[in-house]
Regions:
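Core beta-strand residues in small-molecule sensory/regulatory alpha/beta domains
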Residues: 45, 73-79
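Hydrophobic beta-strand-centered segment that forms part of the acyl-chain substrate-binding groove
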Residues: 17-69, 83-88
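Beta-sandwich strand segments
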Residues: 81-84, 102
Length: 138
């Protein structure tokens, strides 16, 4: 599977996460706001083939009034459900679509995010979080 399909799958996972916190399409239209991905990192841990059944787990690592630090990990349950095959780390920015500037998220969304972060606080930080690109010299 090539990079475009990984990005597409992770993009759908981001949409599902946004729906979960109350930022569905209707809410975005009503509030005239959306989120922009301002930074993204992908890691490829193991090859998957077109047609493999894939699963994505998402979690929010951190947030403030305008930003969300989101992490997705993809597995291939039919091969090895515990083997991470790819990850996607994102920084999302809440944007007022009328001014095209960052804005504070509504209080209801911030409250939902805060609850999610508290529920996930005991989980270990994935090793891929904060990774950088570079050639490691010996």
């Amino acid at each position: 599977m090539n990079v475009a399909y990984y990005v597409l799958i992770f993009d759908h996972a981001t949409d599902a996460f946004l729906e979960c916190i109350g930022m569905n399409e209707a809410a975005r239209i009503a509030s005239r706001a959306s989120v922009f991905v301002v930074e993204a990192h992908l890691t490829y841990e193991k090859e998957v083939m077109v047609g493999d059944a894939l699963s994505v787990e998402s979690r929010i690592l951190d947030a403030d009034s305008k930003r969300m630090h989101l992490f997705h990990q993809m597995t291939c349950p039919s091969n090895n459900p515990d083997q991470v095959v790819a990850t996607n780390e994102l920084m999302l920015l809440y944007v007022d679509m009328m001014t095209r500037r960052s804005a504070d998220m509504p209080a209801t969304i911030r409250s939902t995010i805060k609850k999610l972060i508290c529920n996930q606080n005991d989980l270990p930080t994935p090793i891929q979080v904060g990774s950088t690109i570079g050639i490691r010299r010996r």
